């Protein structure tokens, strides 16, 4: 173990349909990208993402599927011993949100009670198809939800901070310095971000629809 290696480490699995931006998202963290390792037996890349908190550094070993989810589900070996997860969909593609319950089912079948964040990526694109009011799956399953835009770094740290607070058991945990991120490839429109934050707040205060399906 390297001298300044964080003592606190967690396996984080990143799941969701192919093309939703999972790899783009994890590659934003520059040291994680520089130090990633390829696990040939499972066909995954593991990115070590370190975050500095007021309780000391923590490391997420983020398992990224390297695109194999396009050929069907992932093997159990991918999920085994995961301590937390991010499920990602693309807000410009309804089918990727429709598949979220399948990813969640596979995940909790192997990892029963781990903290999970649902992320809707690509919110920088104006032509949004999956609106805040339609995103209800996380409320039914007690997950956390964030709009994100990997290419603009918008809300990049939010899923990791929420998971850290759950895993460490400290709701007041904070990140004390921001990780080095790749420069934004695009700018997130501040007025659009404000509108989406408002829409999510309104949606969170609206009663869930009665139907019992997962969409």
Curated annotation (Swiss-Prot):
Region (Switch-II): 67-83
InterPro entries per UniProt: P-loop_NTPase (IPR027417), Ran_GTPase (IPR002041), Small_GTP-bd (IPR005225), Small_GTPase (IPR001806)
Ranges annotated as spanning the membrane: none
Residues reported to bind GTP: 17-24, 35-41, 67, 121-124, 149-151
Domain Small GTPase Ran-type as annotated: residue spans: 6-170
Annotated stretches, region: Switch-I: 36-44
Catalytic activity annotation: GTP + H2O = GDP + phosphate + H(+)
UniProt-listed Gene3D superfamilies: P-loop containing nucleotide triphosphate hydrolases
Residues marked Essential for GTP hydrolysis (site): 68
A Pfam family reported for this protein in Swiss-Prot or TrEMBL: Ras
Biological process (GO), any one: mitotic sister chromatid segregation
GO CC terms, sorted: cytosol; nuclear envelope; nucleus
Domain of life: Eukaryota
Major place of residence: nucleus
UniProt EC number: 3.6.5.-
Enzyme class: hydrolase
Function description: GTPase involved in nucleocytoplasmic transport, participating both to the import and the export from the nucleus of proteins and RNAs. Switches between a cytoplasmic GDP- and a nuclear GTP-bound state by nucleotide exchange and GTP hydrolysis. Nuclear import receptors such as importin beta bind their substrates only in the absence of GTP-bound RAN and release them upon direct interaction with GTP-bound RAN, while export receptors behave in the opposite way.
Record's protein name: GTP-binding nuclear protein Ran
Lineage of origin: Eukaryota, Metazoa, Chordata, Craniata, Vertebrata
Gene encoding the protein: ran
């Amino acid at each position: 173990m390297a001298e300044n290696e964080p003592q606190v480490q967690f396996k984080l699995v990143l799941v969701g349909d192919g093309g939703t931006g999972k790899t783009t998202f994890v590659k934003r963290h520059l040291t994680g990208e520089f130090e990633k390792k390829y696990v040939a037996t499972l066909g995954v890349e593991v990115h070590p993402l370190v975050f500095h908190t007021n309780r000391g550094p923590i490391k997420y070993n983020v398992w990224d599927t390297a695109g194999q989810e396009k050929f069907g589900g992932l093997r159990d070996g991918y999920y085994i011993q995961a301590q937390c997860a991010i499920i990602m969909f693309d807000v410009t593609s309804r089918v990727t949100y429709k598949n979220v319950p399948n990813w969640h089912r596979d995940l909790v079948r192997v990892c029963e009670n781990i903290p999970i964040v649902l992320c809707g990526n690509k919110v920088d694109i104006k032509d949004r198809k999956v609106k805040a009011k339609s995103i209800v799956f996380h409320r039914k399953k007690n997950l956390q939800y964030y709009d994100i835009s990997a290419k603009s770094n918008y809300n990049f740290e939010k899923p990791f901070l929420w998971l850290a607070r759950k895993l460490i058991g400290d709701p007041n945990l904070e990140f004390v310095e921001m990780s080095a991120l790749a420069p934004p490839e695009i700018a997130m429109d501040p007025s659009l971000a404000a509108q989406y934050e408002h829409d999510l707040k309104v949606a969170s205060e609206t009663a869930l629809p009665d139907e019992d399906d997962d969409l």
